[in-house]
């Protein structure tokens, strides 16, 4: 058999296809290593292992580029001297299309030419971790570049015959878990604690620590003596005062590991010494956890044994209701890369959404909470990424069920029982989604009608009393509920061992600060939008769960698994088999995910605009009906945006105004692929080819491949990609421009 000499070399079938299908299917399956010619399980693991190094190299190269351009074309040193008065610069702009007005609009006062403002938050991170000069940034950029080179080499090396790990090495789950827990999380957290204690904290107190003196500068006056004499409390004594001026010794203490809680009033960020303590605690926990599982030494837990015993006995809660419990899951997870990826994506998705929340509510970076545009950009960015990761988790979960699930190995265990109970699971999710949808929309529409008819007092406004109770129990005083931490006489406030000081002293001050973003006061508008978001989350979950649980087969199509993860239909002779592949569920869920995160970010942004401007009444009064959202959030805040350029000139929002329009264009283009069907494109292509072959110059260029329309699934993918990219581009421009126009 001759090997393919043209793309794709990994598939003989596709390489010999005479149509443009060769290109599109080649691109679509380039990363689906499992389906490549001659692929073995061991080779599959080795290729994936090597690609991880390549992936890391790209990430480090990208990070290096960001740091390098800030050092080269940014204004980092001027910004460090005045972080609340100078706008950080990402990089310079060279654009031959810029006229005089544009050059002036995008040039900062005293600047040498047009620049891009930085809304990434990198400046704040650099400042927090103790970098002070462009030289520090150049050193970081070069270090990241060297690291990228090391990882590229490692990727190449692990593809060489002598350095390819064996399949048994990849399947050694306990050893991998130990190393990832202790090494990846534990030791890296310890190293980060070291950096914070030895470099960042001294720099925050005006003492420079660099490569020249970091081995001779004591981070604490007592040195290591308290550590070895177990007198660790010394490291928490004499923390920075509330009057500490960042980057100077004024008001500075000597503590390196504290438990203050709340924020530094000067920087409006978490105390650096609290964060060092946090990372040290994480390091200890994970290094201990990394010694938990049994490997060559014969000590510790066996995950297989733990899972085998995971079955509550009869007479206890759930006893006897779980069948074989978790038996068989060890091999099921360990032998399926898709299952492992699904679990990893689900965890990472949750963590990324938490990052979005904590970046503003418990802001770790000095002075960043005063840069509202950066805060808004980071929240939106992380929330969208969380959505993509979560949908990806379900997609790979469904691929696992189609390709890797073994019914014999999982007989009557929890996984099999989930599949057996799929009707109950899907119908309950469906009921919840319908309930949330009709009730929430009903309340919004009722309130709209009351507004429209001039009787706003007849709106149905429901106070979120349970959520307010939770806020009050954490110490929020505004509701007057006197419960737990908001009641100084409660057990939470007086508990042993230290009567009232058991809670972090700065916490109550932070949670009750009217200018902060921690536990914002909530009312009827919040109640409604929370339920709208719950509708979106439950419907997205319903679509994804149904897609996964029906991926192997349904009453309509019992042999579905034989058709693979994505198929359009089973021919014209079998009615109702279109749009029911697991891929179609992923495709539909993507729209719901984007929609839901739209509501999440609209809500967050509108509420925060009120907090930042000091006018919280606008959100509170106008978020209880739909016209309020359309008029007072979307329309009112896009007014600045669509005026970025006009017949009379332009301003520094012009680039965002253009991006706003361009995003709409990309988004609208998606419908061209989503609505028209394959035959239409085939006829269009045939007409274009006919015209091409009869045009004097064009006919000199001939295709080697016969042009054919994309498959139905590919057309949908292209449509979805345009819809998604356009949607995100449009909202990114809206968030940045509307916030920057109000906050600078």
Curated annotation (Swiss-Prot):
Catalytic activity: reduced [plastocyanin] + hnu + oxidized [2Fe-2S]-[ferredoxin] = oxidized [plastocyanin] + reduced [2Fe-2S]-[ferredoxin]
Keyword Repeat appears in the UniProt entry: no
Main location: membrane
Protein's cellular compartments: Cellular thylakoid membrane
GO MF entry, a single one: oxidoreductase activity
Residues reported in the UniProt entry to bind chlorophyll a B1: 664
Binding-site residues, [4Fe-4S] cluster: 569, 578
Matches recorded under SUPFAM superfamilies: Photosystem I subunits PsaA/PsaB
Membrane topology per record: Multi-pass membrane protein
Keywords per UniProt: 4Fe-4S, Chlorophyll, Chromophore, Electron transport, Iron, Iron-sulfur, Magnesium, Membrane, Metal-binding, Oxidoreductase, Photosynthesis, Photosystem I, Thylakoid, Transmembrane, Transmembrane helix, Transport
Listed transmembrane segments: 48-71, 137-160, 177-201, 275-293, 337-360, 376-402, 424-446, 527-545, 585-606, 653-675, 717-737
Root EC class: oxidoreductase
Presence of keyword Transmembrane: yes
Signal peptide range: none
An example Gene Ontology CC term for this record: photosystem I
Pfam families for the chain: PsaA_PsaB (PF00223)
PANTHER family: OUTER MEMBRANE PROTEIN, OMPA-RELATED, PHOTOSYSTEM I P700 CHLOROPHYLL A APOPROTEIN A1-RELATED
Annotated protein name in UniProt: Photosystem I P700 chlorophyll a apoprotein A2
Annotated source species: Synechococcus sp. (strain JA-2-3B'a(2-13))
């Amino acid at each position: 058999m001759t090997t393919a000499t043209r793309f794709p070399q990994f598939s003989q079938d596709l390489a010999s296809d005479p149509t443009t299908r060769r290109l599109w299917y080649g691109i679509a399956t380039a990363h689906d290593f499992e389906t490549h010619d001659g692929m073995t399980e061991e080779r599959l693991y080795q290729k994936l292992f090597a690609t991880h190094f390549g992936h890391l190299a790209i990430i480090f190269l990208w990070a290096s580029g960001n740091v390098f351009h800030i050092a080269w074309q940014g204004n980092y040193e001027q910004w460090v001297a005045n972080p609340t008065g100078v706008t950080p610069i990402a990089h310079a702009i060279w654009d031959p299309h810029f006229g005089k007005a544009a050059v002036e609009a995008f040039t900062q006062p005293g600047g040498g030419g047009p620049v891009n403002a930085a809304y990434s938050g990198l400046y704040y991170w650099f400042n927090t971790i103790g970098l002070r000069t462009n030289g520090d940034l150049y050193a970081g950029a070069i270090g990241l570049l060297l690291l990228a080179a090391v990882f590229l080499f490692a990727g190449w090396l692990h593809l060489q015959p002598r350095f390819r790990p064996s399949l048994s090495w990849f399947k050694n789950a306990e050893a991998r878990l130990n190393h990832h827990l202790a090494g990846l999380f534990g030791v890296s957290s310890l190293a980060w604690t070291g950096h914070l204690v030895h470099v960042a904290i001294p720099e925050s107190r005006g003492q420079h620590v660099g490569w020249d003196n970091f081995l001779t500068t004591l981070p604490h006056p007592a040195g290591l003596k308290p550590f070895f004499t177990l007198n660790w409390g010394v490291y928490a004594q004499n923390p920075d005062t509330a009057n500490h001026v960042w980057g100077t010794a004024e008001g500075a203490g000597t503590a390196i590991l504290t438990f203050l809680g709340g924020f530094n009033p000067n920087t409006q960020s978490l105390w650096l010494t609290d964060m060092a303590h946090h990372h040290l605690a994480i390091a200890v926990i994970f290094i201990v956890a990394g010694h938990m599982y049994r490997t060559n030494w014969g000590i510790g837990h066996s995950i297989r044994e733990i899972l085998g015993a995971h079955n509550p006995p009869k007479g206890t809660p759930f006893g006897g209701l779980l069948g074989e419990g978790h038996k068989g899951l060890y091999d099921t997870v360990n032998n399926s890369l898709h299952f492992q990826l699904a679990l990893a994506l689900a965890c990472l998705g949750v963590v990324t959404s938490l990052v979005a929340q904590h970046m503003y509510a418990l802001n770790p970076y000095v002075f960043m909470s005063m840069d509202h545009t950066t805060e808004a950009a980071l929240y939106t960015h992380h929330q969208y990424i969380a959505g993509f990761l979560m949908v990806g988790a379900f997609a790979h979960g469904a691929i696992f069920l189609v390709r890797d699930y073994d019914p014999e190995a999982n007989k009557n265990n929890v996984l099999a029982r989930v599949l057996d109970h799929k009707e109950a699971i899907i119908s309950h999710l469906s009921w919840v989604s319908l309930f949330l949808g009709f009730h929430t929309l009903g309340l919004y529409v009722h309130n709209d009608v009351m507004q429209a008819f001039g009787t706003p007092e007849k709106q149905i406004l429901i106070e979120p009393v349970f959520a307010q109770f939770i806020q009050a129990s954490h110490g929020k005083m505004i509701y007057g509920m006197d419960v737990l931490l908001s009641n100084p006489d409660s057990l939470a406030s007086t508990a042993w061992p230290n009567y009232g000081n058991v809670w972090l002293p700065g916490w109550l001050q932070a949670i009750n600060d009217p200018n902060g973003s921690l536990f914002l006061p909530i009312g009827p508008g919040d109640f409604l939008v929370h339920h709208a978001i719950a509708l979106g989350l439950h419907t997205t979950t319903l679509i994804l769960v149904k897609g996964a649980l029906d991926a192997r087969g349904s009453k309509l199509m019992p042999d579905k698994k034989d058709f693979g993860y994505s198929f359009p239909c089973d021919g014209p002779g079998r009615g109702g088999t279109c749009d029911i592949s697991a891929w179609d569920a992923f495709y539909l869920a993507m729209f719901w995910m984007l929609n839901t995160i739209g509501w999440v970010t609209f809500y967050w942004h509108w509420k925060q605009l009120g907090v930042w401007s000091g006018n919280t009444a606008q959100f509170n009064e106008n978020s209880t009906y739909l016209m309020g959202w359309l008029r007072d959030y979307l329309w009112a805040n896009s007014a600045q945006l669509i005026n970025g350029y006009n017949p009379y000139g332009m301003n520094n929002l012009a680039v965002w105004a253009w991006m706003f329009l361009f995003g709409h264009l990309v988004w609208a283009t998606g419908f061209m692929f989503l609505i028209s069907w394959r035959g239409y494109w085939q006829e269009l292509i045939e007409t274009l080819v006919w015209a091409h072959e009869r045009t004097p110059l064009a006919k000199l260029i001939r295709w080697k491949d016969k042009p054919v329309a994309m498959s139905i699934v590919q057309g949908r993918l292209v449509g979805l990609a345009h819809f998604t990219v356009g949607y995100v581009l449009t909202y990114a421009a809206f968030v940045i421009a509307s916030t920057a126009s109000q906050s600078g």
